[in-house]
């Protein structure tokens, strides 16, 4: 999967100058696995936003892990944590960027979780456990991406 996504990203980057790419999904790999770190993000033009996050999107036994990920083109990544204040847009303007990643998070709303009687703590509230309907939502927690999208006309007038 990582190789197919890499070829697709390369193709888009050849026909478009600085495209805004968002790749999202359950990769069945951790951000640190070779398929994501080397194959998909190895050129440095794509960034895995989930890398370094503390809590996971799914839980196997007592361990949280991150299989659900957002990978974006580097030109969407903010230069620093103050990049969204008005006076910090000048640097981005030179790069003709108008879409930024403002925030990424794993949604951990209480209704998405249940107590884990076997291993302690909490785990995602599943829809099914085998063939048995549990009434929950998923065995993975959802992830959310907050983007700052600037209209070019509005963007360049500042």
Regions found by a protein language model. Give the residues of each.
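Metal-dependent phosphoester-hydrolase catalytic domains
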Residues: 7-21, 28-158
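Metal-dependent phosphoester/phosphodiester hydrolase catalytic core
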Residues: 1-7
